[in-house]
């Protein structure tokens, strides 16, 4: 078989995209029906039977719409084929009834300028239009139901019989009988075809039910919902639903404004334009489905914003592409927490603007998490290209300036409250994060500029990052208190309580736990290094070797392990953050109570250095006893790589839950 060429692949991909777009478009009406049912009202003064009937019909509509929404592509197309055939049949019956019984084609004669009655020209033209219309309905009907050729011709003729009776000027009662018989035949045929297809519908429904039950038993409810979410392209459906709804409302509002102002100009004033925008925003989140649709639109915007920033700063990390997921989840949780869709229109607009400010700060925090690893990698790799450093520094500068501007604008227009305090705290926290990142970046760049080993660099970096983490922890505690005050005295809810618990776990408890773990790892490493003898002075020249970790010569001092291998104290300390074995022979790095008399001890190259004492332990301890350069237990100030990766997520910690927890407990 010949391989499929690129043009054929492009055609196939285009066809798949067309079918996918059509599938999404066919699922959107289900959301409109569900949204209309949820937003409808019933009169409580009616009888119980009427109220019960309305509730039953609404539940039935929701169930049927939900089933159609999750149908497979093939079943969805068949459902719309049969539905379209039914609508064509009903429309054809209505047209025949109205044309045959309610239109007098010969009542209107064209009159010339001299008052002479001419032949009826309107009647034949309407006959032809009706014949073409009914032929279109008939052909579409038999095509959608896939009726056999001979039988299909009879059905088309049955649809045209009332028009033929109208043309032949049959009496009115005969035309009524003809229309009735034609309608009954068409209805009977439709019911017969649907009854034949009922077997297929039963087996299809049973197959879907067994498949769903099988997937639920094997994979669980979560994976089943995720598979359905992706299979039906639910985010795309929500976007199309929300955008078409907003577009329709915008068209109606523009038409009403033009009619009210009695102007034919296409443009409207700025005041009217602002009123239209406010009304569209208010109506764009008036129900749970519309909030989901707005979340889907925000997801698309955030996704492409994240991709653009990643391309601009030159990052290729896959974990940084989660902005399109974190932003909509955070927005939806904020909307649920504040009861956005249930507020009055004026309050809804204010609440939405506040939620968007919180969402903006969350997005900026996430962007900082995308930028910080790139900034650190550029500084540590000693890349001197201006084109590589400028985009990251420019984004970092924007991340510092935008929170300042946002805080200034909000403080200029609003009085101090819990919501403004929370937004300001998040902005200040982001500015501190940027300062910490730029400070560490500067330290690494200074280290790369000089060729001499900077032994205290590790301590300085840890000191800067630890200071930033401590300040973040303080902000987390303050925000928890602010959220507790809001919940107790302003607007408490179950969702807010859950978010506060998540905030306390992710942004307070885990941060303390990880920071303490990092500190203890460093303290243990320092203890182990301090327990090792130090070589300095003339003994370094006798070693005549390099550090096996950094491959630099020993200029000031070196530490010797129990297995007689030499390393820089700083290099060995970094190694001990990861594991407590020797980098060369993988023996435990510790000092035993009894010194082993091992004359076979070797240095990094496996041989004893010239003029070296075969048993150097006592001499080395004597030299180390007078040394005043002992490493203190708490002077180490750089976090290890694992802890740093945990803090490089921008909004910190795991996924959207931590982001929502950090920004959700202070939304008032």
Swiss-Prot record:
Location of Phosphothreonine modifications: 637, 667
Pathway info: Protein modification; protein ubiquitination
Role, per record: E3-ubiquitin ligase; acts as a negative regulator of cell proliferation through mechanisms involving G2/M arrest and cell death. Required for MHC class I ubiquitination in cells expressing the cytomegalovirus protein US2 before dislocation from the endoplasmic reticulum (ER). Affects SREBP processing by hindering the SREBP-SCAP complex translocation from the ER to the Golgi, thereby reducing SREBF2 target gene expression. Involved in the sterol-accelerated degradation of HMGCR. This is achieved through binding to INSIG1 and/or INSIG2 at the ER membrane.
Membrane topology: Multi-pass membrane protein
EC number in record: 2.3.2.27
GO biological process, one term: protein ubiquitination
Sequence positions bearing Phosphoserine: 636
Biased composition (Acidic residues): 631-641
Region (Disordered): 602-668
Reaction catalyzed: S-ubiquitinyl-[E2 ubiquitin-conjugating enzyme]-L-cysteine + [acceptor protein]-L-lysine = [E2 ubiquitin-conjugating enzyme]-L-cysteine + N(6)-ubiquitinyl-[acceptor protein]-L-lysine
Zinc finger (RING-type): 547-586
Molecular functions per Gene Ontology: transferase activity; zinc ion binding
Basic and acidic residues composition bias: residue spans: 618-630
Pfam families: TRC8_N, zf-RING_2
GO cellular component: endoplasmic reticulum; endoplasmic reticulum membrane
Protein name: E3 ubiquitin-protein ligase RNF139
InterPro entries: HRD1_E3_ubiq-ligases, TRC8_N_dom, Znf_RING, Znf_RING-CH, Znf_RING/FYVE/PHD
The keyword Zinc-finger is assigned to this record: yes
Biological source species: Mus musculus (Mouse)
Domain notes: The RING-type zinc finger domain may be essential for ubiquitin ligase activity.
Gene3D superfamilies, A to Z: Zinc/RING finger domain, C3HC4 (zinc finger)
Keywords tagged on the record: Acetylation, Endoplasmic reticulum, Membrane, Metal-binding, Phosphoprotein, Receptor, Transferase, Transmembrane, Transmembrane helix, Ubl conjugation, Ubl conjugation pathway, Zinc, Zinc-finger
Disulfide topology: none
Main location: endoplasmic reticulum
Subcellular location: Endoplasmic reticulum membrane
Record-annotated membrane-spanning stretches: 51-71, 85-105, 125-145, 154-174, 178-198, 293-313, 323-343, 356-376, 390-410, 420-440, 470-490
């Amino acid at each position: 078989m010949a391989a499929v060429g690129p043009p054929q692949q492009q055609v196939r991909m285009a066809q798949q995209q067309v079918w996918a777009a059509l599938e999404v478009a066919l699922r959107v009406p289900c959301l409109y029906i569900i949204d209309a049912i949820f937003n409808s009202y019933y009169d409580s003064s009616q009888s119980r039977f009427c109220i019960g009937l309305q509730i039953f019909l609404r539940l039935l509509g929701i169930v049927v719409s939900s089933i159609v929404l999750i149908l497979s592509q093939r079943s969805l197309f068949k459902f719309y084929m049969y539905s379209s055939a039914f609508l064509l049949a009903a429309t054809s019956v209505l047209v025949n009834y109205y044309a045959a019984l309610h239109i007098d084609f010969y009542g209107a004669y064209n009159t010339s300028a001299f008052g002479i009655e001419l032949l009826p020209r309107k009647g034949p033209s309407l006959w032809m239009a009706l014949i073409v219309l009914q032929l279109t309905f008939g052909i579409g009907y038999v095509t959608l139901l896939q009726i056999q050729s001979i039988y299909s011709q009879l059905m088309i003729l049955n649809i045209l019989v009332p028009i033929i009776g109208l043309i032949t000027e049959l009496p009115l009662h005969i035309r009524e009988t003809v229309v009735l018989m034609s309608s009954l035949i068409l209805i009977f045929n439709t019911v017969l075809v649907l009854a034949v297809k009922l077997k297929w519908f039963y087996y299809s429904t049973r197959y879907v039910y067994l498949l769903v039950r099988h997937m639920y038993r094997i994979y669980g409810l979560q994976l089943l919902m995720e598979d359905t979410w992706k299979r039906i392209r639910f985010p795309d459906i929500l976007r199309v639903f929300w955008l078409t709804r907003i577009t329709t409302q915008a068209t109606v509002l523009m038409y009403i404004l033009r009619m009210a102002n009695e102007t034919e100009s296409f443009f409207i004033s700025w005041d009217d334009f602002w009123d239209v925008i406010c009304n569209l925003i208010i109506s764009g989140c008036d129900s749970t489905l519309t909030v989901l649709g707005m979340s889907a639109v925000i997801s698309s915007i955030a996704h492409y914003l994240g991709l653009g920033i990643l391309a601009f700063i030159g990052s290729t990390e896959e974990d940084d592409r989660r902005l399109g997921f974190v932003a909509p989840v955070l927005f939806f949780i904020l909307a649920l927490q504040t009861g956005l869709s249930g507020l009055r229109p004026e309050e809804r607009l204010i609440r939405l603007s506040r939620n968007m400010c919180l969402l903006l700060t969350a997005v900026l925090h996430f962007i900082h998490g995308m930028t910080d690893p790139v900034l650190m990698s550029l500084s540590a790799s000693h890349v001197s290209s201006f084109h590589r450093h400028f985009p990251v520094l420019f984004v970092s500068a924007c991340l510092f300036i935008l929170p300042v501007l946002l805080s200034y604008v909000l403080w200029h227009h609003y009085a101090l409250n819990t919501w403004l305090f929370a937004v300001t705290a998040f902005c200040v926290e982001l500015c501190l994060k940027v300062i910490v990142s730029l400070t560490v970046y500067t330290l690494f760049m200074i280290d790369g500029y000089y060729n001499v080993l900077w032994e205290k660099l590790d301590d300085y970096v840890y000191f800067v990052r630890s200071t930033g983490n401590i300040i973040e922890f303080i902000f987390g505690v303050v925000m928890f208190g602010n959220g507790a005050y809001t919940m107790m005295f302003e607007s408490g809810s179950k969702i807010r309580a859950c978010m506060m618990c998540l905030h306390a776990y992710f942004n307070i408890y885990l941060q303390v736990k990880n920071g303490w773990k990092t500190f203890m790892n460093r303290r243990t490493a320092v203890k182990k290094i301090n327990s090792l003898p130090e070589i300095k002075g003339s003994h370094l020249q006798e070693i005549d070797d390099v550090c096996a970790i950094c491959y630099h010569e020993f200029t000031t001092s070196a530490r010797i392990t129990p297995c007689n291998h030499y390393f820089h104290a700083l290099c060995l300390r970094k190694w001990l953050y990861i594991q407590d074995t020797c980098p060369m022979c993988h023996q435990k790095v510790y000092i035993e109570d009894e010194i082993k008399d091992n004359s076979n001890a070797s240095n990094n190259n496996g041989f004893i250095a010239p003029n070296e004492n075969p048993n150097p332990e006592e001499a080395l301890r004597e030299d180390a006893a007078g040394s005043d350069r002992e490493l203190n237990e708490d002077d180490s100030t750089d976090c290890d790589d694992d802890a740093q990766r945990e803090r490089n997520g921008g909004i910190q910690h795991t996924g959207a839950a931590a982001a929502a927890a950090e920004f959700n407990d202070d939304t008032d």
